[in-house]
């Protein structure tokens, strides 16, 4: 997860040079976005699987299929929400600790990024796929942080 956050910070940093970098910078930003999505999904699945196996051991054999499905769904959502909180913290850390300085524009970008992240739980409750919701966030962040 630490590597993911480092990659995320590097991706955010590259967005500040997007306009001056030409087509290669744009393609790198897009490939970076989908690389981060893939890594995020892999991490989420791994954490969820570990937590499900831990919980399943606690309630061995005493549950029906419906109860087990509900448990798995709850763990999946809980893990995702926990990771989204950490994405918010990583975005905040980048915005406040960046070498580019803490300007009013950076603060506004941070606020808009966090607002977008806060929309995701509602979209997920409406059965939007996890990866699609996160893709929405990353595309919005790409647009926000690539602006001068």
Roles of regions detected by a PLM:
Residues 1-86, 93-148:
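Charged, glycine-rich active-site and insertion segments that engage polyanionic ligands
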